[in-house]
């Protein structure tokens, strides 16, 4: 009897030790990251709430910019800040005042297009992707619902495109808009822009602009071609450069009227030292500048800048050298003297390879 009792006690002791060991094993296998954390009650979400949480998490992940995009945005902001500081520095340089300053005349106000609905002013600088920006404003003003719907012949028809010029407003309204609206324009290497103007107006010569070939070109040839008896082949680039670099070019400018907007300086077009522009984009960096301008103007959710073909905005040094290779050094220097302000104000390097 005594031995049977001892056997029962021993069995009970073994069972007790097994239970203790099992508890210790369970505690040891718990997630170490959860150690010391109070466990909350388990909540089971309905299927609809599970989907909502999953979608929210997905959006949060997708909306987080990559490191590269953050760097790109920071660089773009810094770049535009440097451009603005350079412009203000050159404008305040007394020795360059005659080069950089111009009156806010009707000629300037005619170049600035207005979107009252979105409080935007855009100064037109031809040969720098200007047409595409006008399309953006036309859509914003509500004349067309999309850029693709705008007929090409309407873009520059200011009776039909719904783009009022700043010159159409009263002096008080002009003042208020210049002081409170978002203002921008685009620039390009000055000499490459002149080449683009020459090719577009005097080489390709669109059919709906016959006056460049039939009126303006002959007038330049008569005054600036060295051998005036040789008039075959139309206007040559050398003739064009002599006209633009002539200190007395205004005589023909008055004769040509507003057609000169395709080759006059940015200073004459937009008065950047008199008007405090928010952004000045560069044609060479338009792929980055266009989205930046839309963001700064607060319209990036309303319209997009048209797709830019690869490489089309890149500065083509060899093309510039080729066009100027037949122009005399004297004529190049005179041309640079006139456009020096555009080079300095917007940070373009002096074309030393042309001298």
Curated annotation (Swiss-Prot):
Keywords: Carbohydrate metabolism, Glycoprotein, Golgi apparatus, Membrane, Signal-anchor, Transferase, Transmembrane, Transmembrane helix. It is found in: Golgi apparatus membrane. It comes from the Eukaryota. GO terms for cellular component: Golgi membrane. InterPro entries: Carb_sulfotrans_8-10, P-loop_NTPase, Sulfotransferase. The keyword Signal does not apply. It holds the Pfam family Sulfotransfer_2. This is Carbohydrate sulfotransferase 10. The lineage of its organism: Eukaryota, Metazoa, Chordata, Craniata, Vertebrata.
